[in-house]
């Protein structure tokens, strides 16, 4: 499956990644060494994650992040 990240807010992207992983917020958090409240805050857009965190998540979930010109 593929998404065009430009069409989504950062909080929507993290939720999509978690849902693709078929993990609960708790399971996803444990896999990343975070707590459930952190995941919940990201998904609700209360807190933003860094690019480094996104790259770490992508690596752990076996996802590829690409950047290309239009």
Where is each model-derived feature located?
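Recognition helix of helix-turn-helix/homeodomain-like DNA-binding domains
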Residues: 33-48
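Short basic helix-loop element that most often maps to the first helix and adjoining turn
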Residues: 12-31, 56
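Residue-level preference for nonpolar/small residues embedded in alpha-helices
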Residues: 10, 49-50
């Amino acid at each position: 499956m593929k998404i065009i990240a430009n069409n989504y807010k950062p909080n929507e992207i993290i939720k999509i990644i978690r849902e693709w992983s078929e993990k609960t917020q708790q399971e996803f958090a444990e896999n990343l060494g975070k707590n459930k409240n952190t995941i919940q805050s990201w998904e609700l857009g209360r807190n933003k994650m860094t690019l480094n965190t996104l790259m770490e998540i992508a690596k752990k979930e076996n996802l590829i992040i690409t950047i290309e010109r239009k």
